[in-house]
């Protein structure tokens, strides 16, 4: 798809919520996004996921050395990478920022974690419902006297994390070009 980001290549390591949302927005504006997913992952989805539109996909089992080599080759020619694994996973796979930025110093390495890279919740899974509940925003939904009615991924995953990830990626990509 043609757009303002045409000519940029982004690697998206498949995840849920904010990472795919950010990659979708970049792809919708013309970036060439390559979604890397586990073999068989599409079969588990049971149909089309609208967050996966506008991009190609590649199945790689990153626990295999050959697949890690393929991803490193892709990253050498990419402008950006989006990953949403828990802290330390990419490093254990040999694909952390220290490795990929040595291979490609101009690579914008976008990390999306629920609770950051360190701190008391860093290793906990992060999901939209957790963020809006912990922040108090869930209290604002629903009717007085009833249980809260959670929004579907709109507040934390999309409006917060995914939007900020896409914006941060764009800012860093502009910075690299200057």
Give each language-model segment a name.
Residues 2-41:
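Conserved small-residue-rich beta-alpha loop and adjacent elements
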Residues 11, 34, 58, 108-110:
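Hydrophobic/aromatic beta-strand patches that form the interior of the parallel beta-sheet core
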Residues 41-53:
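Conserved N-terminal glycine-rich FAD pyrophosphate-binding loop of Rossmann-like flavoproteins
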Residues 2, 48-50, 122-123:
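Short secondary-structure boundary/capping segments
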Residues 11, 51-102:
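A structured beta-alpha segment of the ubiquitous adenosine-cofactor-binding alpha/beta core
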Residues 25, 29, 93-178:
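Active-site-adjacent "lid/gating" segments in soluble enzymes
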Residues 5, 72-76, 124:
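A short, aliphatic-rich alpha-helical micro-motif
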Residues 15, 62, 86-87, 113-114, ...:
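Short glycine-/small-residue-rich Rossmann-like dinucleotide-binding loops
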